[in-house]
Amino acid sequence: MAYPFQLGLQDATSPIMEELTNFHDHTLMIVFLISSLVLYIISLMLTTKLTHTNTMDAQEVETIWTILPAVILILIALPSLRILYMMDEINNPALTVKTMGHQWYWSYEYTDYEDLCFDSYMIPTNDLKPGELRLLEVDNRVVLPMELPIRMLVSSEDVLHSWAVPSLGLKTDAIPGRLNQATVTSNRPGLFYGQCSEICGSNHSFMPIVLEMVPLKHFENWSASMI
């Protein structure tokens, strides 16, 4: 989860988020190099006589500033396309969970089980216990097995929502009449928090998401107790 005054990304918990973090660092390095080069050239122009006000044509320079940006864009596009493909690809999911957005709560249905569905509302501030997080705790957590590919089907019953869990690299739009798919895989157990990331009305800020990733045996015990 995020902390006050945090500057970096949340700790990566899924392979996708690890790839996104690496891509962020890769792109940031390119931006830093370009910015440094531009500032260096500007400083040279302001402090030296390396200017040619009468030069109207420079074929070599035009060739360089055409080819170099193309190479830079390719270096950014190739890893980006690879990650996009990874985010859309899912083979043989161990579990499928259908998520529906409402004003202003989430409902979940485990399609592999009969009658395993529930609504998830934010716990009001006055009802929080010591140590619980304001605006992030829910009455029913989404319990999922760790280290297994899980398919999330996301849609909405009313207006546009967005189901997002940053530490897992997840952000999927919930659109009425349409099912969007996302892949959830966690490398470790724990509680992972998210929120609706699409302005959906007056209580948009009160639609938290809590995923509880547990070992498979614990998940089987939980699902048996819920049915």
Curated annotation (Swiss-Prot):
EC main group: translocase
Gene Ontology terms: cellular component: mitochondrial inner membrane; respiratory chain complex IV
Membrane protein topology class: Multi-pass membrane protein
Keyword terms, alphabetized: Copper, Electron transport, Magnesium, Membrane, Metal-binding, Mitochondrion, Mitochondrion inner membrane, Respiratory chain, Translocase, Transmembrane, Transmembrane helix, Transport
Residues annotated to bind Cu cation A2: C196, E198, C200, H204
Residues given in the record as Cu cation A1 binding sites: H161, C196, C200, M207
Source taxon at top rank: Eukaryota
EC number: 7.1.1.9
Stretches assigned to the Mitochondrial intermembrane side: 1-14, 88-227
NCBIfam families on file: CoxB (TIGR02866)
Quaternary structure (record): Component of the cytochrome c oxidase (complex IV, CIV), a multisubunit enzyme composed of 14 subunits. The complex is composed of a catalytic core of 3 subunits MT-CO1, MT-CO2 and MT-CO3, encoded in the mitochondrial DNA, and 11 supernumerary subunits COX4I, COX5A, COX5B, COX6A, COX6B, COX6C, COX7A, COX7B, COX7C, COX8 and NDUFA4, which are encoded in the nuclear genome.
Protein name as it appears in the record: Cytochrome c oxidase subunit 2
Organism (species): Sundamys muelleri (Mueller's giant sunda rat)
Gene it is expressed from: MT-CO2
